[in-house]
A protein has these predicted regions:
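N-terminal export/assembly segments and adjacent metallocofactor-ligating motifs
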Residues: 1-239, 250, 257, 268, ...
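N-terminal leader/propeptide and maturation segments of large enzyme subunits in energy/redox metabolism
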Residues: 72-77, 239-277, 354-367, 372-376, ...
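Conserved short loop/turn motifs at secondary-structure junctions
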Residues: 105-113, 272-275, 298-305, 337, ...
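Extended redox/cofactor-interaction regions of prokaryotic respiratory oxidoreductases
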Residues: 118-189, 196-203, 226-230, 318-440, ...
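Flexible glycine/proline-enriched surface loops and loop-helix/loop-strand junctions
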Residues: 170, 213-214, 264-267, 296-301, ...
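Short beta-alpha connecting loops at secondary-structure transitions
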Residues: 212-220, 447-449, 453, 464-475, ...
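Long, contiguous, secondary-structure-rich segments that constitute the structural scaffold
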Residues: 475, 481-538, 602, 606-622, ...
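Flexible, glycine-rich terminal cap/loop adjacent to redox cofactors
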Residues: 792-851
Length: 851
């Protein structure tokens, strides 16, 4: 048994893991007891990592060799790496020569390692001469970046996880930490248990599990955070709870902010936010008068057209009360992805350069050009995520290179995103998993390595750099992301820099990291004192860690000096602006999207485990019970949900966690799991068919936390329910085969179930009984078409019932192996129970008679 220390590939907590492996198989995973981010703890996602890497799953879900399509929507053909890289470089050069470098677009990921990010950034900006490289971190963290830079001068969270243990007041806003950062939440729970006097305030439109631990819950209206923060500062000023000495010595711009918040009286704020003014007063008092206040925040602030203003307004509170630069205090942005921070460090966004340099700064461009050995870095701003896909949809960007992310699931306004990939002349998808929706749009698929196979580094929310180590070799012909980018770059150099030494002479991930390290010298994130060897010997470290240092830096700004031209933090007087898409009579509900506890992003990894669907088994939209009652919606009935951009059909579920006129749907449900067709027969996408592409003007982050929608009853009198246990060696192939069939119904969802075994559950609804051939295909695909199955068919009524029994375990009794009910699904509940609990089957005879 081999044991390899590495880092979890899920959220930004950055937990250490110990991977157990035998030969080329990962056999187990446990929390690393020595990693300071988690001290051995793991959440449900992290603790099941080894199961997602089982040989059966790898064979069915992974891209194992390069593949190319000769025509769109056609089958792929396996090709060699030499062929793949040759054709990729030729296509990029052709587009570049015909349309210029800005006709190229690179869309990368916060799940890439720092080394991967660095090479891609240098490839785009240094070699090809385009700043059109952005990342899915634009969807989660760019407002936090902009907020920190606007107020504190640098993209650097000033606090650390240990501050939870020192805080006297926790102010959690826009974060369901219990689900999105579970291991950190365990630390919060322990702090509350050890110190009952620790005050905890949670502000969130939903009464989440995190809110359940709060001493004070503020159920504010969606998008009103800036008004709340201005109102808190108004009260602090009125009551004399600010710190004038700190403001005078360490900040600037306070007078303009005082003028702005003068109008945000408790009455006005209570009205805007939908809160009790007494609760607003209490929150202000606890925040300001606590010896140490730590704020924790995430997508509720970031994913907004006011994202930068929200971040800045919260940081204003810390500056006004001196709650920064000391143990237990500070504005602490929780990173969404495992290496969104590392991507920011290397400048892997359209507006950034290496080591927190700004693309708009001529001095910074010159420094990076000198480091990379190029004449210049282009000054033309690059296209950010939403702009990039809109430009491709409009025909401006001709080639897209997508690495380690799934925009056909995760981007807002899916119709535009999919049109972009359809219209682009050339689409490359560099990906570990073959099952993502984006893979269907690729002209060229390049197999990449993933967790358990990669070497490099990541940086978590508290600026802590951890090593990622390989326990096994990548399967098939999969290659490391940085190496794929290097191989591409060297081919491009033969045409763009003939006869000159390569700019990409990297022999390992470490050699890439060393160049990145040098780029940080003298910068706010200086890591010139670090090395792979030091990280091996001393474990994960927090930056800055400059040359000559003996340890990292837990907290920033303890001396009151900030990385701004005058050394002072800057108050930001940003006005309150409502959500971009307000509710209106035609669209009377707010849609909020967010995470589930046991899933991650588009579920290309977590979605292969039936046990991770035990918490939330299938797609639903949640509504307040009173809103459902007014519309005569029944729990579990199908509704059509529509925004100005698209629609979907989904079951409705009552939730008292929500306020009136609010709805919630998990961000994970893409077209891989939730599908159907519209009135014109066009396929329906997942939840992001509904979401808004409107962005924050400063951060360019889209407002995924709010869209105006309508929810209507839909009459689909014909329904289908099918469930079947499937062999581990074929279950994911079966799911892939079912996906195109799902698009032939008005509504369909397909999800795995089971704990020790795995099966698939398919639900569908339609306006009329579909062609019997379609049901035959489903039966065949789920293994229910054998001669031994019990079966009843009534073609005139569009009804069918089928049950496959398994007697292999006990010849004297049988259990359900699978069933299909079409046209009449009244028996679904008890048959589902018999199947999932493996109760000895006693299927009533009338189930297979004409009713």
């Amino acid at each position: 048994m081999k044991h390899t220390r590495s880092t979890c590939p899920y959220c930004g907590v950055g937990c250490g893991v110990v991977i157990e492996s035998q030969g080329q198989h990962i056999t187990g995973v446990r929390g690393d007891p020595e990693h300071p981010a988690n001290w051995g703890r793991l959440c449900t996602k992290g603790s099941t990592l080894a199961l997602t890497a089982s040989p059966h799953i790898q064979q069915q879900t992974r891209l194992l060799h390069p593949q190319m399509r000769t025509q769109r929507q056609g089958a792929t053909q396996a090709i060699s790496w030499e062929q793949a890289l040759d054709v990729a470089s030729q296509k990029l050069l052709d587009v570049m020569h015909r349309h210029g470098p800005d006709a190229l677009g690179f869309y990368v990921s916060g799940q890439l390692l720092t080394e991967d990010y660095y090479v891609f950034n240098k490839l785009a900006k240094g070699l090809l001469g385009t700043n059109n490289i952005d990342t899915n971190s634009r969807l989660c963290m760019s407002s936090a970046v902009a907020g920190y830079k606007l107020t504190l001068g640098a993209d650097a969270p000033p606090a650390c996880y240990e501050d939870v243990d020192h805080a006297q007041c926790l102010f959690i806003v826009g974060s369901n930490t219990a689900w999105a950062h579970p291991v950190l939440f365990r630390r919060i729970e322990e702090a509350k248990a050890a110190r009952p006097d620790l005050k905890m305030v949670v502000a969130d439109p939903r009464r989440t599990e995190t809110a359940g631990l709060a001493d004070l819950f503020l159920p504010l209206q969606p998008g009103t955070d800036v008004a709340l923060f201005h109102g808190l500062l108004h009260i602090m000023l009125w009551e004399g709870w600010t710190q004038p000495d700190f403001i005078a010595q360490h900040t600037s711009g306070f007078e303009a902010l005082k003028t702005l918040v003068r109008d945000f009286t408790p009455d006005k704020v209570a009205d805007i936010c939908g809160l009790r003014k007494e609760d607003v007063f209490t929150a202000a008092q606890w925040f300001a008068t606590s010896p140490a206040t730590l704020s924790l925040y995430c997508q509720g602030l970031n994913q907004s057209t006011s994202g930068t203003a929200k971040n800045a307004a919260l940081i204003n509170l810390h500056l006004a009360t001196g709650q920064i630069g000391k143990p237990g205090a500070g504005p602490f942005s929780l990173t969404g992805q495992p290496n969104a921070m590392g991507g920011r460090e290397v400048g892997g966004m359209a507006n950034l350069l290496s080591a927190h340099r700004d693309l708009a700064n001529p001095k910074h461009r010159a420094e990076v050009a000198a480091l990379w050995g190029v004449d210049h870095v282009p000054e033309q701003p690059g296209k950010t995520a939403v702009d990039m896909f809109e430009a491709a949809a409009d025909g401006q960007i001709k080639a897209l290179w997508i690495a380690c992310t799934n925009p056909a699931q995760s981007m807002p306004h899916q119709s535009t995103v999919r049109r972009a990939m359809e219209r682009a002349e050339w689409v490359v998808v560099q990906e570990a998993f073959a099952s993502t929706a984006t893979c269907a749009y690729a002209d060229l698929l390049l197999p990449a390595s993933t967790w358990g196979e990669k070497e490099g580094t990541v940086t978590n929310s508290e600026r802590r750099i951890s090593r990622v180590r390989a326990a096994i070799e990548p399967p098939g012909q999969a290659r490391h992301d940085w190496y794929i980018a290097v191989q591409l770059a060297q081919r491009l150099e033969q045409h763009l820099r003939p006869g000159q030494p390569s700019l990409f002479q990297y022999s390992s991930a470490e050699s890439v990291w060393l160049e990145h390290r040098e780029s940080t010298r003298g910068r706010d994130l200086d890591i010139t004192g670090l090395s792979y060897e030091l990280l091996e010997q001393q474990g994960p470290q927090q930056w800055p860690f400059a040359s000559g240092s003996t340890q990292g830096t837990a907290r920033l700004y303890q001396d009151g000096v900030f990385p701004t031209p005058d050394g002072r933090a800057q108050f930001a007087a940003k006005p309150y602006v409502a959500v971009a898409e307000k509710r209106e009579p035609k669209y009377p509900f707010s849609l909020n999207t967010g995470r589930l506890r046991d899933h991650w992003h588009g579920m290309s990894r977590t979605g292969v485990l039936g046990r991770l669907f035990g918490h939330v088994p299938e797609p639903v939209i949640q509504m307040h019970p009173q809103d459902m009652a007014r519309r005569n919606f029944i729990e579990g009935s199908l509704v059509r949900v529509s925004s100005k951009r698209g629609s979907l059909v989904v079951p409705v579920q009552a939730s008292a966690e929500l306020g009136l006129s609010q709805t919630f749907m998990a961000m994970h449900w893409g077209s891989e799991y939730l599908s159907g067709q519209d009135a014109q027969g066009m396929p329906l996408g997942g939840v992001n068919a509904l979401t808004s592409p409107e962005v924050c003007p400063s951060s360019h982050q889209p407002e995924l936390k709010h869209a105006a929608i309508k929810v209507e009853a839909i009459d689909l009198p014909w329904s289908l329910m099918a469930m079947a246990w499937l062999p581990a060696s074929s279950v994911w192939q079966v799911q892939s085969q079912l996906r195109p069939l799902m698009n032939r119904f008005d509504f369909a969802s397909c999800v795995p179930f089971g704990r020790e075994r795995t099966g698939l559950m398919l639900r569908a609804g339609h306006a009329h009984a579909p062609d019997a051939v379609l049901i035959d295909e489903i039966e065949q695909t789920l293994g229910l078409a054998s001669n031994t199955a019990l079966r009843y068919v009534d073609p005139q009524r569009g009804q069918r019932r089928c049950a496959q029994l398994d007697t292999s375990l006990d010849s004297n009794s049988s259990v359900l192996q699978g069933f299909l009910l079409a046209g009449d699904t009244q028996s679904a509940a008890w048959m589902s129970t018999m199947l999932t609990q493996q109760i000895p089957a006693q299927v009533p005879a009338q189930t297979f008679r004409r009713q």
